[in-house]
C-alpha cells in the first residue's frame, strides 16, 4: 500500500493497516454514505457484540417517547426532544466506537437513525447489515491467513519432516 500512495508531501510514516473504503448503498443501488473499515481488526467482533448487547441501554431514553413516522419527535415537547437527542448521541458514540471513526456520519447522514423502516428502526437495519458484512469480511481474511499458514506447515503435518533431515 505504501508504494501505491502518491507523493503527498507527507514526511511521516505510512503503515498499511488494512483499511478499506466501503460505499453504503440503499436497496436501489444509490450510494448513501462511505465509511472506512479494517476487516482484519480482530477487536471489531467484540465491539460489535458489545453494541448489540447494549442496544436496549442505548435506546432506553426512547421508552416513553412518541416517534413520528419520519423518525422525529414533537419539537414542542422538550422532554421528548431531549430524550431523542440523548439516544441519538448514545447511538452515534457507540457506532463510532465500533469502527473507530466515521460510522455514524456515514450511515445516518442522510436518514435519522430512529426512522422506522419495516417495523424496525433504521439503525437496527444498518447495524444488522454491518454485522453480516463484518462476519463475511473477517471469515475471508481468516481463510487467507489459514491458507498461507498451511503452505508453510504442510510438511510438518504430513510427517514429511518427522525424522529430520537425512
Sequence positions of predicted segments:
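Generic detector of short, locally flexible boundary/turn motifs and exposed helical patches
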Residues: 1, 71-72, 96-97
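Short, charged/polar N-terminal "headpieces" of proteins
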Residues: 1-57, 148-159, 163-166
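N-proximal short alpha-helices
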Residues: 17, 77-80, 114-118
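Short, compositionally biased low-complexity segments
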Residues: 23-26, 54-65, 96-103
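Generic signal for short, ordered secondary-structure residues
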Residues: 30, 34-37, 73-74, 86, ...
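Acidic, aromatic-enriched beta-alpha/helix-loop junctions
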Residues: 41-83, 87
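C-terminal charged interaction modules
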Residues: 93, 97-166
Amino acid at each position: 500500500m505504501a508504494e501505491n500512495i502518491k507523493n503527498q508531501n507527507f514526511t511521516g510514516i505510512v503503515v498499511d493497516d488494512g483499511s478499506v473504503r466501503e460505499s453504503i448503498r440503499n436497496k436501489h443501488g444509490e450510494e448513501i454514505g462511505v465509511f472506512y473499515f479494517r476487516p482484519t481488526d480482530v477487536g471489531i467482533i467484540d465491539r460489535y457484540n458489545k453494541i448489540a448487547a447494549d442496544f436496549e441501554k442505548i435506546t432506553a431514553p426512547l421508552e416513553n417517547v412518541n416517534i413520528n413516522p419520519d423518525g422525529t419527535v414533537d419539537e414542542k415537547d422538550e422532554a421528548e426532544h431531549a430524550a431523542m437527542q440523548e439516544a441519538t448521541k448514545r447511538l452515534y458514540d457507540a457506532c463510532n466506537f465500533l469502527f473507530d471513526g466515521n460510522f455514524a456520519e456515514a450511515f445516518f447522514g442522510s436518514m435519522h437513525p430512529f426512522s422506522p423502516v419495516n417495523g424496525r428502526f433504521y439503525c437496527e437495519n444498518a447495524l444488522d447489515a454491518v454485522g453480516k458484512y463484518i462476519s463475511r469480511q473477517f471469515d475471508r481474511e481468516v481463510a487467507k491467513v489459514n491458507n498461507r499458514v498451511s503452505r508453510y506447515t504442510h510438511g510438518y503435518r504430513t510427517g514429511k519432516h518427522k525424522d529430520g533431515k537425512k
